[in-house]
Amino acid sequence: MKPGFSPRGGGFGGRGGFGDRGGRGGRGGFGGGRGRGGGFRGRGRGGGGGGGGGGGGGRGGGGFHSGGNRGRGRGGKRGNQSGKNVMVEPHRHEGVFICRGKEDALVTKNLVPGESVYGEKRVSISEGDDKIEYRAWNPFRSKLAAAILGGVDQIHIKPGAKVLYLGAASGTTVSHVSDIVGPDGLVYAVEFSHRSGRDLINLAKKRTNIIPVIEDARHPHKYRMLIAMVDVIFADVAQPDQTRIVALNAHTFLRNGGHFVISIKANCIDSTASAEAVFASEVKKMQQENMKPQEQLTLEPYERDHAVVVGVYRPPPKVKN
């Protein structure tokens, strides 16, 4: 094992991500910075930190307790809430916010106010004469949200960024990335399945910063005329050759010094080896492709045997004094 490489596996404070200090401090990944908290004060495993009601609220199943009707029974939906007893504050990742109410939740600022993408909770906060709407981001449905709540040091996705998203599926996480990069950013969303692709195209009709690409990510040359150079690649493809897939796309579209965020599902790569061995093997493959991993983080308790690896592509050479 390389010196300075200490992947942050397993142990988390409290309930891991929700406990007193979500990510477990220590040195983040490949000699990266410290993994700071990221966890919330919520209780139990219900989505954004609440009782057992689906998306993380109490019995009504919502993330925001600020007026509005109670849901029907456990886990019922509550509609758009007015944020009287709710406070939204910026997370340390630019473009991501924490909604503090009776329970805390991770949220993003809705690019298309009034529109819910996958039935997620929304909350409106009055700022002067304006109302700003935020959307709850469930870490059990999004690897990126799980990584943020687990205390990942950097996601490199921020307002104005151009992001290539491989394995976009129906666009659950893509919609939140679209919120983060905002009107000045772009999300190129690549998905091979035509059924999911239909959802993605419908999503892009309302969110003009999403460009859906219904193609196989193994063949970036087929869509090279659709995509400009990007700042970040996010990959959630769950394929045995996923590092090769990401590398092919990085060589074609990722600028030198750009970053990658890869979600690794150990079972999809080698179901016979331990998760730690699979992660270490994938990291080695990345290093052979001019991809320099800087941080590794497991996604417990939200996903089992998953890890996220964050790194830089073709970093500029260090200047010797």
Swiss-Prot record:
Pfam families: Fibrillarin (PF01269). The keyword Ribonucleoprotein applies. The modification Phosphoserine is found at residues 116, 124, 126. It comes from the Eukaryota. Residues 274-306 are annotated as: Helical. The modification N6-acetyllysine is found at residues 102, 121, 205-206. S-adenosyl-L-methionine binds at residues 172-173, 191-192, 216-217, 236-239. This is rRNA 2'-O-methyltransferase fibrillarin.
